Amino acid sequence: MNSSIEISSYRDQHFKGSRSEQEKLLKASSTLYMGNLSFYTTEEQIYELYSRCGDIRRVIMGLDKYKKTPCGFCFVEYYAREDAENCMRYINGTRLDDRIIRCDWDAGFIEGRQYGRGKTGGQVRDEYRTDYDGGRGGYGKIIAQKINPNTLER
């Protein structure tokens, strides 16, 4: 198997089912998780780039749970596993909006997963980031709150 399309060690901790059920779904899936997107990347940009690998069934943009604004990830569902494999081969690790995008297999989108799981509504990884990243909303949420306690509002 090509290392660019292998199943990674990451597993969705909120998956409802056994580890072996999740593995089976991942190996047959045509859904990909895309991470490290800019908060400003649009659904149209996702379609434009990812459709180069095949026909897309749908794109589900990741949203802040409270603000309903993009928070740096999405799910891309292809019609065919082969197209998703091509995406893993050719698009994973490339740049979009000056960011290196991460692609990973997903067991299949379930309603509710489009929302960030962090305490503040976004992604958990953005809450603990200590650097400034303009493409992902500036400083991490915890640092931003220390700098200006009024920055975290729901």
From Swiss-Prot:
Where is this protein localized, as stated in its record? Answer: Nucleus
Q: Which residues bind mRNA?
A: 10, 33, 102-106, 113-117, 123-124
Give a yes or no for keyword Nucleus in this entry: yes
Domain RRM: residue ranges: 30-108
GO terms for MF? RNA cap binding
What is known about its subunit structure?
Component of the nuclear cap-binding complex (CBC), a heterodimer composed of Cbp80 and Cbp20 that interacts with m7GpppG-capped RNA.
* Name of this chain's protein: Nuclear cap-binding protein subunit 2
Its source organism is Bombyx mori (Silk moth)
